[in-house]
UniProtKB/Swiss-Prot annotation:
Gene encoding the protein: tyrS
One Gene Ontology term, aspect cellular component: cytosol
Domain S4 RNA-binding residues, every copy: 345-411
Keyword field contains Repressor: no
Function: Catalyzes the attachment of tyrosine to tRNA(Tyr) in a two-step reaction: tyrosine is first activated by ATP to form Tyr-AMP and then transferred to the acceptor end of tRNA(Tyr).
Motif ('KMSKS' region): 231-235
EC number per UniProt: 6.1.1.1
Enzymatic reactions: tRNA(Tyr) + L-tyrosine + ATP = L-tyrosyl-tRNA(Tyr) + AMP + diphosphate + H(+)
GO molecular function: ATP binding; RNA binding; tyrosine-tRNA ligase activity
UniProt source species: Rickettsia akari (strain Hartford)
InterPro entries attached to this UniProt entry: aa-tRNA-synth_Ic, Rossmann-like_a/b/a_fold, S4_RNA-bd_sf, Tyr-tRNA-ligase, Tyr-tRNA-ligase_bac-type, Tyr-tRNA-ligase_bac_1
Protein name: Tyrosine--tRNA ligase
Residues that, per the record, bind ATP: K234
Keywords from the named record: Aminoacyl-tRNA synthetase, ATP-binding, Cytoplasm, Ligase, Nucleotide-binding, Protein biosynthesis, RNA-binding
Amino acid sequence: MSFIEEFINKGYFHQCTDLDRLTTITKETKIAAYIGFDCTATSLHIGSLMQIMILRLLQRHGHKPIVIIGGGTSKIGDPTWKDEARKILSKEDIAKNAKGIKKSLSKFIKFGDGKSDAIMFDNVEWLDSLNYLEFLRDFGVHFSINRMLTMDSVKLRLEREQHLSFLEFNYMLLQAYDFYYLSKHYNCSLQLGGSDQWGNIVMGADLIRKISRKEVFGMTTPLLTTSSGAKMGKTAAGAVWLNEDLLSPYDYYQYWRNCEDADVIRFAKLYSELTSEELNEFERLAAEDINAAKKKLAYELTKLCHSEQAAKSALETAVKIFEQGEIDESLPTVVLEQALLQTGISAYELFHDVGLASSKSEARKLIRGKGAKINDKLVEDENIIINTTFLLDKNAIKLSAGKKRHILVRV
């Protein structure tokens, strides 16, 4: 199966500037293709997982993945489908975030000097040195304001009479220049991105054709939601991060283990590397025992992101908690100052402080709704004082929010 055939078969395809021609070229030769990521956090989350799996697919088929860490464009902010302007990041924040993002990507693709090894750049390397007057003279003439105003992402803000600064309006020009720069210096002939980036991608391809007369392509992926319409990558407890310093492998496993029934097969196709035969077997398993299929999905995706050992450990922890009723030492742990527990803290404050509720009011709601447990016993009073008398034999307090989220509190 070719790169494009597998790309479509896995459900990645949404739109392409010339699919037939790109299919032919990728069969005949190896290309360089790029995807860009904004430097807005110290880790990528599963909202970027499709794009990451595409980079991995490119590499597996012998093509060269190029990753752009948008340090330069992060100084401006992409207005695409945003209701308001983004906060502009400092150089220090961008550098810190870029390091974390490379850590996320390195879990899935190999960086190096080989023909199909991935390479990564921060677009600040070329954007910072752009001379504004020369940029306007050499490139500005190729962009139509008329066309830019018709792009849905811009039109939406204008129709709502929301502020769209000139700073943000320049984002699409700079993204187009990124594609031009990579085409010129690294022979990059394909830009990939989410369907919300279509307008920006097409502008870059058009710029290259006008200036360099080179054949390049743009291809987008669908914007994914869960079957209930929730945005991928976000939960009530926060983002589902790929880096273990922000989300433990156990919690990563639990996210996939608890996905909606209707998403299980789709997620296996999108995010795992099960073969066609294995996927057929997985579909049969899902039809017979959906919970067994969810465990299989969670195991495979945790193994891919973290390691096989991490996946085994997460599975064992889940079995001990949910099937054997034990406290497991590998549960996510929060350490509190001993003085705090000696004095005592109300139950609702504790659930908020350890991250099991996004606010104190949410913590109260959790307890009132009979969703909070301490040491596997239902919390009846949100104001009950939790102190050192609640410590178990293993010198820990087990907090549970619902059936799936658990934390050990230690001093």
